[in-house]
A protein has these predicted regions:
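Short helix/loop capping segments that flank catalytic or ligand/cofactor-binding pockets
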Residues: 27-28, 56-57, 102, 194-195
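Compact, glycine/acidic-enriched structural inserts
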Residues: 51-68
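Structural motif
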Residues: 20-22, 49-51, 70, 94-98
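Conserved small/polar residues in nucleotide/adenosyl-binding loops
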Residues: 196-201
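Terminal domain-start leader segments
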Residues: 1-46, 77-81, 85-88, 109-115, ...
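Short, basic/aromatic beta-hairpin or loop at an interaction surface
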Residues: 179-190
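Conserved beta-strand termini and adjacent loop/short-helix elements that scaffold enzyme active sites
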Residues: 19-20, 67-71, 116-120, 182
Length: 201
């Protein structure tokens, strides 16, 4: 994944790339917790987090330099700006569709670094699955199938859709999901077209 990103950086004449989308952070680095950002340069990779996650980050990302921003800067954006200056980065790409104006202003406090907005770069990498990713998808499908087989037995009159969705999330974890799945929605009957509901089945 890093090789793909660095090839892109070279083609676009970028000295660095700043990653703030948590799914993309995980894809590039393998880091599974929240509150993490990456600054990738041509020769180094930095994972920016806060002290709560340092030990976890070191364990999961041994090839990364783990940096804590708290106490070193008012916010992550200004810390990333300082780091870009320190590393002598002249042009750094970032995920423009995820950045607030305030965050962008913080990045732009680096006087000698140009921040260049990009869109869908890492998502494009993610769209083509490696053999290892395909195997992981098969495992995920098996987990979902087993959880679905369990939830079928719980569907009966008087149980709410909200309760069933909660049980399904629980079964997913019990069957081997790394984390509680986000956004499970279980709806039946006449209200199926609604995204959120809690009526009884």
């Amino acid at each position: 994944m890093l090789e793909q990103l660095r090839t892109y950086m070279e083609k676009q004449n970028l000295d660095g790339f700043f990653v703030q989308n948590h799914e993309n952070v995980r894809y590039i680095s393998g880091y599974t917790s929240d509150d993490a950002y990456l600054l990738i340069t041509r020769g180094r990779q930095f994972l920016i987090t806060d002290p709560r996650y340092t030990e976890h980050a070191q364990a999961e990302c041994p090839d990364y330099t783990i940096l804590n921003w708290r106490g070193a800067a008012p916010n992550v954006g200004e810390y990333a700006a300082q780091l870009a200056e320190q590393e002598g980065l002249k042009a750094v790409g970032f995920e423009k569709d995820l950045l607030t104006v305030k965050f962008h202003e913080a990045l732009c406090t680096a006087p000698h670094t140009e921040w260049i907005g990009t869109e869908g770069v890492i998502e494009e990498f993610r769209s083509v699955k490696t053999p290892e990713e395909i195997e992981k998808l098969k495992v995920a499908c098996d987990i979902a199938s087993r959880a679905f087989e369990r939830i079928i037995k719980d569907i009966r009159v008087g149980v709410t859709e909200k309760e069933l969705a909660s049980r399904l999330s629980h079964y997913m974890v019990m069957e081997g999901s790394d984390t509680k799945p986000y956004g499970n929605i279980l709806i039946s009957g006449a209200r199926t077209c609604l995204l959120y509901t809690s009526r009884c089945v």
